[in-house]
Structure formats: structure tokens, C-alpha cells
């Protein structure tokens, strides 16, 4: 059967299109460097030009274009609107393309960007050396002296001036006499000495100003014949179209305002003059040449005519003394000068200005007369254009790997395998690419995917985008009172609802703000996609592992973390634990009366049909060992019970509650006598639950009772007997009066977890110590911290994940009131609550309210104490879908707020920062309240300038399933700490630097630019003993990857350092593009695997260096997200607050705001959803 379109099958019976769909564009820059870009066959010249512009950090692309040698060895400018490959295949002598200036300005002072002036300088120097601009001997010597000063600096840096003889100083083939050449070179050497102290930008500016006054500046001519058949050269210049006769006659210039029309017919090019009724014709070599000259002149005419007023009236003063600094990232502010539209060289259609003849688009057309999109398309979104250039072409490239389709995943167009010539460099504070990620180039470690892979990613992205449109608002909770009332009625503090972007008191000391919206109508709305994510599919193995996440064997996982394995989750159902009430708990306690009224109505109108409960409690009391019971205390800093919706083992039967819990002496209960809440077991009891165990309840405020925060004082744990229950053993009835209070002076250490109890070291059971030592997620420095040895670590079961009860660490917000006042003194707090006392409720009555809500109203929190003999039990891990539901539920019900507030921001003890507080180190700290702990700080080899070896950086080590994750968290380097920063990189063997900020945000410096800018002079910068060179840079949408070479000047050793900068973090809040942030984490993983594969396998893997501004906020987000994703990949227990607490014990205040903490949840949810789609 014949194939369509005339396709022929090979003997392999396969047809591969990948080899025919790509183009490797080899482009020579003005500094004679070659770069290569892998594009699709449909990629236009404009896309290639923009790739070069990104590579050079060039914003003013107006003046530049690409050209090639045709088969007659003549220069021809590329038609930017047409596919580049077709033009090269049809006309080019070789596939090499050249970058250069196509439009010259009357004065180089009009150029806004320094890199533009530098490229202009290279172009003009090239014109002089190639003889395109004729000059005299004196002019050549003068220009050569300026060029040497600009290129090589002051003469006293060199032993002699003999090196000048090795470089081309004069036009090629111009000076044949060796004696004259030597004399001219000596004069250049004298001028070089004369220009001592002149900076490179100054010398370049003087060079360009000298050239722009010379004849031939901005001219481009082509051979032709006039009407008499005489040989002439015709071309365009600044003033108009010139004609130069080769017989010695004076040149003739037809000024732009005198030309009424231009046309071409066959091999003739004609000018129609406005003041004369005549047409002047010129004959060219052939029809193609005539058409090309016509297109070029039309473009020049339109460009200069529209620029005439602007260029003459513009009063832009460029300071020639402004130094080109590799560390300066701020760009000149936009001037009122408006660029004209790109000139049009058309093949078809009509020129709408004064011309009527047909023409073709060589440059990007623009009907509005403004040259805006050629600049803004590279650095900002075209909001008014809806992501399209004004001629209708889509912003993204038509390349194979950046598919020009609406999809959430877009792979950047890969480049050749040479890592030294990759990339684009567009990282600036005001440069946030939004739509155009067309010709970006990935680094060498990410190879080009084949055609099938690209198509799979395309299809996957479309499916994912479709699924992403669904929201969580379909939960059947609309009938509850809180959801049917306006937000101002439901939430107790409208100022939080109305001003969610303002900084919270908890974050008032830092430049971050609280941006989590408590009043969002959709608890977890999917963010609007602002741009396609480039590089999001670069590491498929990172997310593919999620497919088998639940199949991983777990005999060695959490052996000592004992808990009851939760049953599988049922199908989706309406909310199950009064989210309308739980939302109130996480706003504030400063206005309890408002909360009381809202909760009162919510409880009063709560009906069974509004929230049908499909889940019941598996366990509501804690089995206590004798040693555990001996040290049990009750904390009444109000733990909020967020009850798991994944436990179905028990059904609530009965509840009793003492009228005054604080006044009742502690009494023990047996296994069969459970106070407050009765449970009917539907699962087989474990053998470890023997009669000698005791059950105790943690008194914690429920949704309704978290109206007033009590004090930090601790009172006895109350044990109550249910009437009619079996009598407990005598030994269990004995009261333990010694347990009423904490020992005086005992510090309270609150850890993230459902149970926080501080005990003397001698009373910690061995099993609990083993649990601390063998936790799957633990810090390697944990055992070195004495204060942690006295803590009972919380259980890390999946049920704990859904338990919102964790103590608040914000003690300044707690009111010191005994719990007896809460339970007995305020009888009218919530009228809808059952009366306190020994009243019993039947099963039917309890069922009306529901077990989850009823247990919450009684202050119960799900938590298990690990038993010594339960260490062998291994629980079944939840699937990705279940984990995703759990995380979404926590966000939806607002549990994250109190969860975050209970995590200590810094150590309570053993947190000395003596070295950081030394007077000589004060200037090395960006913020005086963010300091590294002495025991985990990065210690440098002391130097004369830094005799303490101090840098504001901390080691962070976390072990996940036996794999150690090693980080260094540090602040953004200051100008005076760049040398220390690179010394740390060298001594610690850093291979990857993850930067999560821009150099400047909102006019404030976030990090000094410590690496050289690509395109700057020699791409190098030196800090002390280290020389840093930028080899390449590639922009991938929301992040940029830069390859750096680091050389130790004393030893000559060299290393490669990867710099990964996330560029999409807003000044306030957190990124909305979750997949973009995930693609950044995947890029870190890709580079980490690449560096580890090339390093010595016997040496330990180097730590990942992460920094933002202070080195705690965004830095903590990156580290916490990576570790939690690793837990998901290894099917470990997901306990985000406990891991964050571990991190904060090694560097204070990591994940600085609630907004950032919530962002980590959203990232994990997005990760689970993405892994589910693969």
C-alpha cells in the first residue's frame, strides 16, 4: 500500500522525521565567536535573531540582523519573516550566518543599552579593518590607539608594546610597506600610553564618535549601471540613496524626503522623485539583485524617515564615563524615545506609505508605526497583543522542541552538544520573559528529545491542561452555614480578607509578606498559567518514579515509627470535618468574640445532610506505657484537632466530659474503660494492646473551642471513668500528684507533631530514643544536639499528617488563662455545644453530629505514642492520589496556618551565634537577625582579610531513606563578601549554585552580582585568588542556567560550576507558576546527576549551594520542597512541619513566611498531580 505524500519506507519499515525536522544554525558574532542553535526547519530568521539577542543580553534588537554569503559570495541580509533554513538552502554559499548592524544611527549617543554600544563598536571596528569605511593613515592610527586601549586596557599592564604587532590594527591589505607599518605601530603604542586611565567604555565611545564623522559610515552599496551604461555603486546611507560613479564623478545623493516612490521591474531598480516628474532607473546584475536592493532601500527609507524626528529631537545624554561592570545588572531607564517600527522588505502586498509597487517582508512588519515589539518581546509580556506579534505570528518558536501549541510543558529548543557555546542570557531585574521562549537552548546534559518524545509531551500537556481546569469547589459543602454566607460574615477579621497581601506581624521584620488568602472562594484554585514552562520535561525520570511510588518495598522504612496502618481512602466525597468551622481557627485569636459568633451560628445550623460523614475514627485515645504515663503532662496552649478523613476503624459511641476538667485529680483508666469517647472496634486488636496499657486524652481545643488561647501553663492530664465501665486495676487508680506541673525552669520545646512532651533525659524510653535515631527523615547532626535527646519525637504516620493539632510557638499571642476558665467559666461560648458534665448521648444522637466533628468538639487529636514492641510493624504507605487529597484538604481547611505557627523559627537552646556576632563580622551579614549557628556554620580557611574564616552560611544535612541530602544555605553575597563566597565554593567543592532571587527587586539590592555577565569584556571577573569566567548561559523561561569556569590563580586548577538562577519569583508573595518552579527543581536534579556522574565516584557528592537574599526564605522553600519530593519518591512519610523543624535547627527562620510554607504544599500537590499524569 503506497504511503501518502510520496513517502517511501526503508528496509527497516520505519520512517524517521527527526533528522529532517531540525536545523543547526551556526552564527558568527561580531567578536568572531561562533554559536550554534538547534531550531526547527520552520524557524524564522526573527527567531534566530532573538536567540542571539538573548545570548548577548541585547534588548535593542532594532539595529541588528543576520546576513549570509550568497552563492556569488555577496552579502545578503536574511529575510526575518521567512524560514531560515529555506533561505540558506536556496541562496547561501555555506550554512554559516553572521550577526551584524543593519541600521546605523546618526549618533551613537542615541543607543540606550551598554551592550548595544559594545556591539556597535565591534561592528564599526570590523568595518574599518575590512575597509568598508575608508580612512586615512592618521585616522587609522588614531582609531587603532583607541581600539587598543578599549581592548587591552592600560599599557603599563604589559612589559612591552611588542604584542601590538600580533594584532590587526589597520585595514587588511592596506599597508604593504613593512617600514610604514612599523612606524604606524609605534605611533599606536604612543597613543596607547597617552590614553592611560581611559576606561573601555570611554575608549569605545570615542572610537565610535570618530567613525561616525567619517565618509562611508552607515553605507551599504551594490554594483549597478546607470542609464548611460556606466558602472556605478548604488546603496543606502543615513541621508538617502547614494550613487557613486567609478569614473571619478562626484557622488549623487537622493535624499529620503525627495523620494516619492521606489520600484523594481525585472533587473531594473527605479526611483520616482517628488519634486521632479521623472523616474531614474538603474540596471542591476539580475532580477533577484534588483528586488533585494529595492527591499533594502525601502526598509532603510522607512526606518530613517520615521526616526528622523525622534533622532534629531531626542535629548538623550549618555555618560561616556559610565563603567562597564560585570557586577552591574541595573539597566538604563526607558527614555521617552519611541523606536520606530521595523522596516519592511516585502515580497508580496503593497507598501502602504508612498509606494504602490509590490514588496515583500524582510523584517517584522508593523502597521502602527512604533517599534515596540522588537524590544519588548524579549523582556516583557505584550499584554495588549495577547501574546502575539502585531503581524499575527505567535510569540513562541516553531521549533521541534518548543512546540508552537498551547500546552503547559514546552521544551526549549536544544543546541549542539558543545556546552561552551550554548544559551541565552536575559537575567535582569526588569527582564522576565513571558511569551517568547522560542530559540532558547538547553545545556549539554539535556539532549534533544526525538520526535516521538516531543509529540508525547505535547499530548500529555494538552491532557494535563484539560484536567487542570477542574476545581475543588465541587465538594458538597455549600449547605453549611459558613459557605452560604458572605466572606465578611464568616471570617472574624475582614482586614486579613481585604488586605491579604500586607505583611503579617509574624513577618514584619523581613521583606516578605503574607499573601495566602483565607477568603478564597476556591480553597485551592489552580493558578492561571502566565507562560509556557520551558524545560519542564527535561527530567522525566524524576516524575516517572511516582508511578511506582506505592510499590516500593518498605521493610526498612519507619521501623520504629509505630502507628496503626490507615485503611484505603474511599472515593471522593463531600467534606467530612466541618471545614466551615475549621477555617476560623487559623486567622487570629485577637478577636475571639467575632469568632465566637461565627462559630456559634455555624454549629447551630450544622445539619447531618450538609456534611455526610463517610469516615470514622480509628483511634481516639493513646495507649500509654508505664514509663510514658509517669511523665505525661497536659499542655493547654490549645491544640486544634484536625481529624483525619482516612481512618475508618472506629465508630463513635458515647462521650462524657467533666464539668471542670482542671479540678479533677488524675485518675487512670483501663483498656476497657475509655473516658470521654467510647470506641467500637471494627478491626482486630493488635496483640500489643494489653490490659496493662492506659489510655489518655490530649486536651486540645476543637473547632468551636479555639476561641480563646489559654496560657502556656501546664496542668494535670485528666483521666475520667465512664460510669458502668469495668473497674481498672488498683495500681492504675493511684493518682500521680507529682505530674501536675513541669519542673521549674524546664524549657518548653515545641516540635511539629501531634504530641510534644518535654521530659528529663533519664525518663525517655529506649524505644523512643531508637525512634529518634532511626527516623527515615532526620538530620545527621541530630545526635549531637543535647536538647533533642530529652524530647519525645512525634509519630510520623499518615494519620498524623492530617492531624492539625500542633502547638503554637507564637507565645506572645497567647493569653494566660487556665483551662478551667475555658471549660467551666464560659458556659455561653458556643450555645450549640452539648452541655458539659456526665451527660450521655446515644449512638443516634452522636451520629447526627458525626464522629469527626464530635471528637473535634471534645478536643481530641489523633496521635499515637510508639510502643517498644510495635517497632516491627510496617504500615502501608498511601498512594499518590491519597497523599494529594490529604495535602489539598489541609490547604482547603486552613490547617496549614496553625501548623506553620507552631514550628519554632529558631533554636531555644544551644543556638549560639558567637562568631557571627563578632564586631569584625557585622559587615559580612546582610541582616543582623539572620545568623548561622556556630556548630553548623561553614568555616573558611582564615585569611588576612577574614581571620575568623566567617561567612553567613550554614550546613544543612537531611537523610531520607538512608540517602543524605547535603546543602549549604547562605545569604546573597555582598560586595565585600564575594571573595569569601567564591572561597567557600572552592573549599566546599560546590558544583551547583542555586540562586532564587534577582540582583535587584523593587530598587533594593538582593544579591551583588558575583559572576561575570556574558557578553561583557572577556566574560571574566577576579575575586582574590579566584578567576571566574562565564562560558555560556541558557534561558529556560522561569530560570536561567549558566556555565562558569572557576580557576585558582595560585595553583592553576580549574573547575566547572553551574549557576541556576530562578527568575520568576515575584517581589511580593510566591510564584503562581507551580510547574515552572517544579521545572527549576528538575533542572537542579538534572545538573546534580550530571555533575555527580562526571565526578570521582569514591568522593562524596558536593553539597548544593542555595541562596536568595537573606538565605532563609526562598532558600528554605527550595530545600524543603526538594526533601519532601524525595520523601514522595521514596514513599516515605510526609511530615512537612517536622522536616521544616529539622531544617530550622540547622539554620534559623527557613521558609520565612506562611505564604512560602503554603507554596511548598502547592508545589507538592502539583508534583503529585503531574506524576499521576505520566
Swiss-Prot record:
The modification Phosphoserine is found at residues 577, 589-590, 637, 673, 710-711, 797, 799, 804. Residues 681-692 have a biased composition (Basic and acidic residues). GO terms for molecular function: protein tyrosine phosphatase activity. The keyword Metal-binding does not apply. GO terms for biological process: protein dephosphorylation. Residues 896-1167 form the Tyrosine-protein phosphatase domain. One of its GO terms (cellular component) is cytoplasm. Residues 396-445, 673-692, 711-745, 769-806 are annotated as: Disordered. Its EC number is 3.1.3.48. This is Tyrosine-protein phosphatase non-receptor type 21. It comes from Homo sapiens (Human). The gene is PTPN21.
Amino acid at each position: 500500500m503506497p504511503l501518502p505524500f510520496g513517502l517511501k519506507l526503508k528496509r527497516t519499515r520505519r520512517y524517521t522525521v527527526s533528522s529532517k525536522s531540525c536545523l543547526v544554525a551556526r552564527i558568527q558574532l561580531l567578536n568572531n565567536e561562533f554559536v550554534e542553535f538547534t531550531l526547527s526547519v520552520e524557524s524564522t530568521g526573527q527567531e534566530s535573531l532573538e536567540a542571539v539577542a538573548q545570548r548577548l543580553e541585547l534588548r535593542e534588537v532594532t539595529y541588528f540582523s543576520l546576513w549570509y554569503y550568497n552563492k556569488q559570495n555577496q552579502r545578503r541580509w536574511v529575510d526575518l519573516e521567512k524560514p531560515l533554513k529555506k533561505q540558506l538552502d536556496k541562496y547561501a554559499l555555506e550554512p554559516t550566518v553572521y550577526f551584524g548592524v543593519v541600521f546605523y544611527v546618526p549618533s551613537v549617543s542615541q543607543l540606550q543599552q551598554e551592550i548595544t554600544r559594545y556591539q556597535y563598536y565591534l561592528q564599526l571596528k570590523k568595518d574599518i579593518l575590512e575597509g568598508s569605511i575608508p580612512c586615512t593613515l592618521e585616522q587609522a592610527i588614531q582609531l587603532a590607539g583607541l581600539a587598543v586601549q578599549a581592548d587591552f586596557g592600560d599599557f603599563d599592564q604589559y612589559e612591552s608594546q611588542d604584542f601590538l604587532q600580533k594584532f590587526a590594527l589597520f585595514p587588511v591589505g592596506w599597508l604593504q610597506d613593512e617600514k610604514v607599518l612599523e612606524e604606524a605601530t609605534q605611533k599606536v603604542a604612543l597613543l596607547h600610553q597617552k590614553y592611560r586611565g581611559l576606561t573601555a567604555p570611554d575608549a569605545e565611545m570615542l572610537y565610535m564618535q570618530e567613525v561616525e564623522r567619517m565618509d562611508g559610515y552607515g553605507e551599504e552599496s551594490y554594483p549597478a549601471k546607470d542609464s548611460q551604461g556606466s558602472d556605478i555603486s548604488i546603496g543606502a546611507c543615513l541621508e538617502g540613496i547614494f550613487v557613486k560613479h567609478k569614473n571619478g564623478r562626484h557622488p549623487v545623493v537622493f535624499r529620503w524626503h525627495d523620494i516619492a516612490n521606489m520600484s523594481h521591474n525585472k533587473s531594473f531598480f527605479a526611483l520616482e522623485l517628488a519634486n521632479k516628474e521623472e523616474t531614474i532607473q538603474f540596471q542591476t546584475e539580475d532580477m533577484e539583485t534588483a528586488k533585494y536592493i529595492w527591499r533594502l532601500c525601502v526598509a532603510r527609507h522607512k526606518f530613517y524617515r520615521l526616526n528622523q524626528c525622534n533622532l534629531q529631537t531626542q535629548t538623550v545624554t549618555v555618560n561616556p564615563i559610565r563603567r562597564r561592570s560585570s557586577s552591574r545588572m541595573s539597566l538604563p531607564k526607558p527614555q521617552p524615545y519611541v523606536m520606530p517600527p521595523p522596516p519592511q522588505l516585502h515580497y508580496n502586498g503593497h507598501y502602504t506609505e508612498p509606494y504602490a509597487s509590490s514588496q515583500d517582508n524582510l523584517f517584522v512588519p508593523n502597521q502602527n508605526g512604533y517599534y515596540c515589539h522588537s524590544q519588548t518581546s524579549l523582556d516583557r509580556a505584550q499584554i495588549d497583543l495577547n501574546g502575539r506579534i502585531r503581524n499575527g505570528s505567535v510569540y513562541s518558536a516553531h521549533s521541534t522542541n518548543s512546540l508552537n501549541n498551547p500546552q503547559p510543558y514546552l521544551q526549549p529548543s536544544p543546541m549542539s552538544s558543545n556546552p561552551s557555546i550554548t544559551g541565552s542570557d536575559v537575567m535582569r531585574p526588569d527582564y522576565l520573559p513571558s511569551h517568547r521562549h522560542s530559540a532558547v537552548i538547553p545545556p549539554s546534559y539535556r539532549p534533544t528529545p526525538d520526535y516521538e518524545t516531543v509529540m508525547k509531551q505535547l499530548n500529555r500537556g494538552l491532557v494535563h491542561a484539560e484536567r487542570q481546569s477542574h476545581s475543588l469547589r465541587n465538594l458538597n459543602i455549600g449547605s453549611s452555614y459558613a459557605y452560604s454566607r458572605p466572606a465578611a460574615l464568616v471570617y472574624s477579621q475582614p482586614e486579613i480578607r481585604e488586605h491579604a497581601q500586607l505583611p503579617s506581624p509574624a513577618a514584619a521584620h523581613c521583606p516578605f509578606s503574607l499573601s495566602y488568602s483565607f477568603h478564597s472562594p476556591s480553597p485551592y484554585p489552580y493558578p492561571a498559567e502566565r507562560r509556557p514552562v520551558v524545560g519542564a520535561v527535561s527530567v522525566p525520570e524524576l516524575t516517572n518514579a511516582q508511578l511506582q511510588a506505592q510499590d516500593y518495598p518498605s521493610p526498612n522504612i519507619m521501623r520504629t515509627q509505630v502507628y496503626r496502618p490507615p485503611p484505603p481512602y474511599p472515593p471522593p466525597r463531600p467534606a467530612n470535618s466541618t471545614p466551615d468551622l475549621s477555617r476560623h481557627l487559623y486567622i487570629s485569636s485577637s478577636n475571639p468574640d467575632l469568632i465566637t459568633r461565627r462559630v456559634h451560628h455555624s454549629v447551630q445550623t450544622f445539619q447531618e445532610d450538609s456534611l455526610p460523614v463517610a469516615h470514622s475514627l480509628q483511634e481516639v485515645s493513646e495507649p500509654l506505657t508505664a514509663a510514658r504515663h509517669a511523665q505525661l503532662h497536659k499542655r493547654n496552649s490549645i491544640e486544634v484537632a484536625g481529624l483525619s478523613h482516612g481512618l475508618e476503624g472506629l465508630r463513635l459511641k458515647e462521650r462524657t466530659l467533666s464539668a471542670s476538667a482542671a479540678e479533677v485529680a488524675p485518675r487512670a483508666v483501663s483498656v476497657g474503660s475509655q473516658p470521654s469517647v467510647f470506641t467500637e472496634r471494627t478491626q482486630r486488636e493488635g496483640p500489643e494492646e494489653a490490659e496493662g496499657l492506659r489510655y489518655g486524652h490530649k486536651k486540645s481545643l476543637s473547632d468551636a473551642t479555639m476561641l480563646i488561647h489559654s496560657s502556656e501553663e501546664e496542668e494535670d492530664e485528666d483521666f475520667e471513668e465512664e460510669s458502668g465501665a469495668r473497674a481498672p486495676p488498683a495500681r492504675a487508680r493511684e493518682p500521680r500528684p507529682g505530674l501536675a506541673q513541669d519542673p521549674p525552669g524546664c524549657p518548653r520545646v515545641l516540635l511539629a507533631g501531634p504530641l510534644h512532651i518535654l521530659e528529663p533525659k533519664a525518663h525517655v524510653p529506649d524505644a523512643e530514643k531508637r525512634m529518634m535515631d532511626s527516623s527515615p527523615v532526620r538530620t545527621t547532626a541530630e545526635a549531637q544536639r543535647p536538647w533533642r535527646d530529652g524530647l519525645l519525637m512525634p509519630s510520623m504516620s499518615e494519620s498524623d499528617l492530617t492531624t492539625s493539632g500542633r502547638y503554637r510557638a507564637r507565645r506572645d499571642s497567647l493569653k494566660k488563662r487556665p483551662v478551667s476558665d475555658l471549660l467551666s467559666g464560659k458556659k455561653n461560648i458556643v450555645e450549640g455545644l452539648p452541655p458539659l458534665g456526665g451527660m450521655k448521648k446515644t449512638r443516634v444522637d452522636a451520629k447526627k453530629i458525626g464522629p469527626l466533628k464530635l471528637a473535634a468538639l471534645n478536643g481530641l487529636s489523633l496521635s499515637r505514642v510508639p510502643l517498644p514492641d510495635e517497632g516491627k510493624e510496617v504500615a502501608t504507605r498511601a498512594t499518590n492520589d491519597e497523599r494529594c487529597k490529604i495535602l489539598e484538604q489541609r490547604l482547603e481547611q486552613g490547617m496549614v496556618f496553625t501548623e506553620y505557627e507552631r514550628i519554632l523559627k529558631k533554636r531555644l537552646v544551644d543556638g549560639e551565634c558567637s562568631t557571627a556576632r563578632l564586631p569584625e563580622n557585622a559587615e559580612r551579614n546582610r541582616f543582623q537577625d539572620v545568623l548561622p549557628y556556630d556548630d553548623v556554620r561553614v568555616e573558611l580557611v582564615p585569611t588576612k582579610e577574614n581571620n575568623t574564616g566567617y561567612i553567613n552560611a550554614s550546613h544543612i544535612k537531611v537523610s531520607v531513606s538512608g540517602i543524605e541530602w547535603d546543602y549549604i544555605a547562605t545569604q546573597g553575597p555582598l560586595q565585600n563578601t564575594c571573595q569569601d563566597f567564591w572561597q567557600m565554593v572552592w573549599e566546599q567543592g560546590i558544583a551547583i549554585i542555586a540562586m532564587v532571587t534577582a540582583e535587584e527587586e523593587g530598587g533594593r539590592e538582593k544579591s551583588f552580582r558575583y559572576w561575570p555577565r556574558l557578553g561583557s569584556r572577556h566574560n571574566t571577573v577576579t575575586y582574590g585568588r579566584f578567576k571566574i569566567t562565564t562560558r555560556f548561559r541558557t534561558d529556560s523561561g522561569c530560570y536561567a542556567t549558566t556555565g562558569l569556569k572557576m580557576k585558582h590563580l595560585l595553583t592553576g586548577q580549574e573547575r566547572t560550576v553551574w549557576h541556576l538562577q530562578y527568575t520568576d519569583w515575584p517581589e511580593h508573595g510566591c510564584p503562581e507558576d507551580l510547574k515552572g518552579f517544579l521545572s527549576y527543581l528538575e533542572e537542579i536534579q538534572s545538573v546534580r546527576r550530571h555533575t555527580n556522574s562526571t565526578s570521582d565516584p569514591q568522593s562524596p557528592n558536593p553539597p548544593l549551594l542555595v541562596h536568595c537574599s537573606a538565605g532563609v526564605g526562598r532558600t528554605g522553600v527550595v530545600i524543603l520542597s526538594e526533601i519532601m519530593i524525595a520523601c514522595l519518591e521514596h514513599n516515605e512519610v510526609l511530615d512537612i512541619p517536622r522536616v521544616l523543624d529539622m531544617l530550622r535547627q540547622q539554620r534559623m527562620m527557613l521558609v520565612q513566611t506562611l505564604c512560602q510554607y503554603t507554596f511548598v504544599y502547592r508545589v507538592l500537590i502539583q508534583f503529585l498531580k503531574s506524576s499521576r499524569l505520566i
